[in-house]
């Protein structure tokens, strides 16, 4: 089940996943970023994956997406990304390490296109700026 978290009180029935994400981390991010939202993939009240994004006026930006190691390669990241695309219905941008091949394939599958390269952005590793334009 995917749950949209807009404010800390939305977390009342969710348990922390110390290896992945805690409610205190979510609360902190939501207080610092007024545009921030979390999509949580939850099983048995436990967080098994999340997508943290900023919904900024005319666009949305994916800040982070992660799935617990034991739940990878099961379509969880795809489900989170699909849900976000439906929710925001606007252009979406992100940045990914050039070496993160699984993530790049996922983004290309959902029609994200490479826009620019940030040379050495991640401690010597290039970053790829990607964008998915709304198809209207």
PLM ranges: what are they?
Residues 2-70, 81-83, 87, 135:
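Acetyl-CoA-dependent GNAT
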Residues 35, 58, 100, 121-126:
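Short acidic/glycine-enriched loop/turn segments that link adjacent beta-strands
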Residues 93-97, 108, 113-129:
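Conserved catalytic-core motifs of GNAT/GCN5-like acyltransferases
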Residues 65-82, 97-105, 109-110:
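Conserved glycine-rich acetyl-CoA-binding loop
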Residues 49, 73-77, 116:
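Glycine-centered flexibility sites
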């Amino acid at each position: 089940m995917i749950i949209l978290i807009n404010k800390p009180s939305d977390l009342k029935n969710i348990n922390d996943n110390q290896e992945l994400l805690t409610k205190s981390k979510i609360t902190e991010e939501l207080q610092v970023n007024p545009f921030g939202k979390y999509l949580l993939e939850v099983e048995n009240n436990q967080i098994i994956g999340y997508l943290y994004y900023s919904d900024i006026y005319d666009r949305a930006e994916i800040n982070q997406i992660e799935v617990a190691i034991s739940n990878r390669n099961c379509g969880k990241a795809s489900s989170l990304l699909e849900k976000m695309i439906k929710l925001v219905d606007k252009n979406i941008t992100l940045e990914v390490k050039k070496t993160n091949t699984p993530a790049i394939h996922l983004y290309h599958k959902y029609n994200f296109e490479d826009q620019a390269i940030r040379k050495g952005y991640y401690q010597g590793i290039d970053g790829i700026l990607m964008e998915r334009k709304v198809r209207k």
